[in-house]
């Protein structure tokens, strides 16, 4: 699947519709359909009471509905379309099955969320690993191999550890992974066992990227996989990244892989609508590509290389401490 296929695949409409279906229930709960039925909902109004306290969730719901043509952006806000008017009339059907039976739907998939994260960490780890294996890992492994690792690889946010194993096997170096989720670390046991069977030295531990306490002087390259956007605000994230210099005193590179928000997209798509909407429900505003680059600079890093990845709105950044020599990209 190419980048274009994420938007043009028939599955894109199914996925985007699933996200928008939940957004319709949320929009109704927040009173958005009633407000839009009266006319344009202006951005300046969303920044005032009664909307302000739910501003991020409101934006997430409106953007999800834009992708299915129920709401459209206008110069200074949002307005309901004919499809949106029809949807508003059918919202009780969505509320009945998606709202009234939400716990039944959730219960069919998993028996409980990870207390540390509030999400089903095992599902996140395994699904992310499968997405990575299909669309990302070969690019990432090639990128890390090009850096000619001279010691241990540390992967922060390693999930099941599958990518870490693949990297370490390719470059013939040991590895260590950290993940906040106990469920993810549990899922990684199988990967660690496989590594031992084939003679690759890797270990996976539970750990918080913002509170690492153990020094790893043998680590040459640190990777941080699709979780930097969870560390906020920017000043705090920059401080966390600076702390890695103490935790990994001999590391030559910090390589960050992450996803940034969509920019005014109105088309059905695989992956991106989920990223944008779920983070809005978590009251999070992931930083933009430009904001990420500025934050890396604030943290004391130079971006040596930026690679656009196959998953929409996703990038790899090869970072080096500013006091090291070499041209920046």
Curated annotation (Swiss-Prot):
Gene3D superfamilies: Vaccinia Virus protein VP39, Winged helix-like DNA-binding domain superfamily/Winged helix DNA-binding domain. GO terms for molecular function: indolepyruvate C-methyltransferase activity. Its EC number is 2.1.1.47. Disruption phenotype: Cells laking this gene are unable to produce indolmycenate. Keywords: Antibiotic biosynthesis, Methyltransferase, S-adenosyl-L-methionine, Transferase. It holds the Pfam family Methyltransf_25. It comes from the Bacteria. The keyword Transferase applies. GO terms for biological process: antibiotic biosynthetic process; methylation. It catalyses: indole-3-pyruvate + S-adenosyl-L-methionine = (R)-3-(indol-3-yl)-2-oxobutanoate + S-adenosyl-L-homocysteine + H(+). Optimum pH is 7.5-8.5. Loss of methyltransferase activity at pH 5.5 and below. This is Indolepyruvate C-methyltransferase. The lineage of its organism: Bacteria, Bacillati, Actinomycetota, Actinomycetes, Kitasatosporales.
């Amino acid at each position: 699947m190419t980048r274009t296929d994420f938007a043009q695949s028939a599955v894109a409409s199914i996925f985007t519709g699933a996200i928008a279906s939940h957004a319709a229930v949320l929009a109704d709960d927040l009173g958005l359909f009633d407000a839009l039925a009266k006319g344009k909902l202006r951005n300046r109004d969303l920044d005032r009471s009664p909307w302000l306290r739910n501003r991020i969730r409101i934006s997430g719901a409106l953007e999800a509905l834009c992708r299915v043509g129920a709401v459209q952006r206008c110069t200074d806000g949002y307005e309901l379309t004919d499809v949106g008017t029809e949807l508003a009339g059918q919202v009780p059907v969505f509320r009945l099955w998606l709202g009234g039976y939400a716990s039944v739907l959730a219960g069919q998939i998993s028996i409980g969320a990870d207390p540390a994260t509030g999400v089903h960490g095992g599902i996140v780890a395994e699904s992310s690993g499968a997405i990575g294996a299909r669309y990302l890992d070969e690019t990432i492994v090639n990128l890390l191999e090009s850096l000619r690792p001279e010691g241990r690889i540390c992967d922060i946010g390693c999930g099941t550890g599958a990518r870490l194993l693949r990297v370490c096997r390719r470059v013939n170096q040991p590895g260590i992974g950290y993940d906040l989720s106990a469920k993810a670390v549990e899922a990684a046991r199988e990967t660690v066992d496989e590594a031992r069977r084939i003679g690759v030295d890797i270990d996976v531990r539970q750990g918080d990227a913002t509170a690492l306490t153990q020094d790893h002087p043998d680590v040459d390259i640190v990777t941080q996989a699709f979780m930097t956007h969870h560390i906020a605000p920017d000043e705090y994230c920059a401080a966390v990244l600076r702390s890695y210099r103490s935790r990994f005193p001999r590391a030559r590179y910090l390589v960050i892989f992450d996803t940034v928000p969509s920019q005014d997209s109105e088309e059905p798509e695989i992956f991106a609508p989920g990223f944008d909407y779920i983070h809005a429900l978590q009251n999070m505003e992931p930083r933009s590509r430009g904001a990420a680059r500025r934050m890396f600079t604030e943290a004391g890093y130079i971006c040596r290389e930026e690679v656009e990845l196959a998953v929409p709105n996703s990038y790899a950044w090869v970072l080096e401490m500013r006091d090291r020599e070499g041209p920046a990209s």
